[in-house]
Amino acid sequence: MKKHDGIIVLLSGGMDSATLLWLAKREFKKVYAISFDYGQRHKVELKYAKELAKLAEVEDHFIVQVPFYTSLKGSALIDESVEVPKGEYPENEPPVTTVPMRNLIFLSIASAFADNLEVNYIGIGVHALDTPYPDCRPEFITAAEAAINAGSTFVAKKKERMHVYAPFLGMSKRDIALLGKELGVPFEKTYSCYMGTEPPCGECPTCIQREEALRGIL
């Protein structure tokens, strides 16, 4: 199977982005990773992202500071005055853990690195259960890809398209876990907890989803 040339993967340190990183290693010749320190409550995830990038032997791992998020209020992930919810995500509205425009900002920054590195794929691990978040939906990914192509120096010079690689859009978290098992992802070295505690709290929405997805695997 022919491999694509290069990709930069958004790597949080969680099971979804780790699986995407291992999938990228299989599908691409050159793999870069990028992580973000945006004042998140669960900043400990960056420690896991660094270890995963090292294990995956990526070309380079960039950790980017996004300090302005600490000025925003209302999200449980960046505002310590907002309590992290327990239990499942709400079904029909964005949860209190939504960080405004996070994936738009992250994809924009990653696209600048992709432009500079001259790789034309940007990987993001959004999946079917992420749909309560507006910036995880298929229509957002399509729009983001269009905007990146409209503004890319790489595209203008090379006459090649940029692609937002989001292979998990139609997959459940369990599907991702099973794929990760097949790829040999070290799930024990991933981290998913909105509280940012070690060990994880086991009660927040992402802890619950992780436990259900990895049942019988980890």
Swiss-Prot record:
It catalyses: 7-carboxy-7-deazaguanine + NH4(+) + ATP = 7-cyano-7-deazaguanine + ADP + phosphate + H2O + H(+). Pathway: Purine metabolism; 7-cyano-7-deazaguanine biosynthesis. Keywords: ATP-binding, Ligase, Metal-binding, Nucleotide-binding, Queuosine biosynthesis, Zinc. InterPro entries: QueC (IPR018317), Rossmann-like_a/b/a_fold (IPR014729). GO terms for molecular function: ATP binding; ligase activity, forming carbon-nitrogen bonds; zinc ion binding. Pfam families: QueC (PF06508). GO terms for biological process: queuosine biosynthetic process. Binds 1 zinc ion per subunit. Its cofactor is Zn(2+). Its EC number is 6.3.4.20. Zn(2+) binds at residues 193, 201, 204, 207. ATP binds at residues 11-21. Coiled coil: none annotated. It is an enzyme of class 6 (ligase). HAMAP family: QueC (MF_01633). Belongs to the QueC family. Catalyzes the ATP-dependent conversion of 7-carboxy-7-deazaguanine (CDG) to 7-cyano-7-deazaguanine (preQ(0)). This is 7-cyano-7-deazaguanine synthase. It comes from Aquifex aeolicus (strain VF5).
